[in-house]
UniProtKB/Swiss-Prot annotation:
This is Nitrogenase-stabilizing/protective protein NifW. The keyword Cytoplasm does not apply. It comes from Enterobacter agglomerans. May protect the nitrogenase Fe-Mo protein from oxidative damage. Homotrimer; associates with NifD. HAMAP family: NifW. GO terms for biological process: nitrogen fixation. The keyword RNA-binding does not apply. Belongs to the NifW family.
Length: 112
């Protein structure tokens, strides 16, 4: 992910909105406010998995990195807002597979 941190200006971004402004992406501010953690977690996963292609021309390589990061951020936003959070979010709280139920009587038995 070193390629991402080398993009000029990225180290100054402090909020989800600042990322979208930096990469010149239009988003619904209400959705961004309510789902920013999920979007940015998805973006981080995509950044970690991405392997950019570097060109001999350093200026073109920098622009390609910016375009790749922009595309990954846009994909993260689209994926997260496309449906309900419990199916679209990659956060662990939504990935619990084993539900459990403890009956009221069982709870009363433990009581001193």
């Amino acid at each position: 992910m070193d390629w991402f941190t080398r993009i000029e200006g990225v180290d100054e971004l402090e909020s989800a909105q600042s990322f979208f402004d930096f990469f010149e992406l239009e988003v619904d501010p209400v959705l961004l406010r309510s789902r920013h953690l999920h979007i940015m977690a998805q973006f981080n996963q995509r950044l970690t998995a991405a392997v950019p292609v570097h060109f001999v021309d350093e200026e073109e390589s920098d622009r390609a990195d910016w375009r790749l990061a922009r595309r990954l951020l846009a994909e993260s936003y689209q994926h997260t807002v496309a449906g309900p959070l419990n199916t679209q979010s990659g956060l662990a709280v939504y990935q619990r597979n084993n539900g459990s139920f403890i009956g009221w009587n069982d709870l009363l038995e433990v009581r001193p």
